[in-house]
Amino acid sequence: MKTPNFIESYQTEQYDFCDRVIARLEEYISSQDDSNVAMHFMNGSVTNGGEQSRRDYSFNFQAMQDPLVVEMHEILRQYIPNYAEIYNGFGMQGCMSETMKVQKTPPKGGFHTWHAEHARNESASWRNLTWTLYLNDIPDGEGETEFIEYGMKVQPKKGLLCFFPAAWTHTHRGNPVYSCDKYIATGW
């Protein structure tokens, strides 16, 4: 369905995939000792010159040969054409990254600063389209992805795949969770 804000969500039935991604992240977290956590996770660290603090665990699955990354790309290939058809001319070429970032946000954790995914710095300047797959259900009123310009919130629901432009026009944040962990997979 075409919306005036270029934010589209599709309820997939990828529940088993969601469970496997969560299990893989939890396995990775439990295998790390304290000396390695800082290299792979943002657990109370501060980024962007001290302006943005966050408390969550994230891991970038970078290997294109990783079965979970390959499977995520297959899922994206099912839904990106729908988005491209609705918004023809958006320019979907090369919109899938090689990286799948998986995050676990504990209660009262997260990254709540307004931000956009496309930035001037070299590591984010190529981003055009953001996708987020919510890996678990979150109670209403918690953990939404909120878009400031549109007064819109996307409620996390297991298997929900959300697409939106990475530009400043889609400045957003993740709202806090209070009662459970929140898991997402995301990329650009």
Where are these regions (language model features)?
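Catalytic core of non-heme Fe(II) oxygenases with the double-stranded beta-helix
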Residues: 70-188
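Non-heme Fe(II)/2-oxoglutarate
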Residues: 1-92
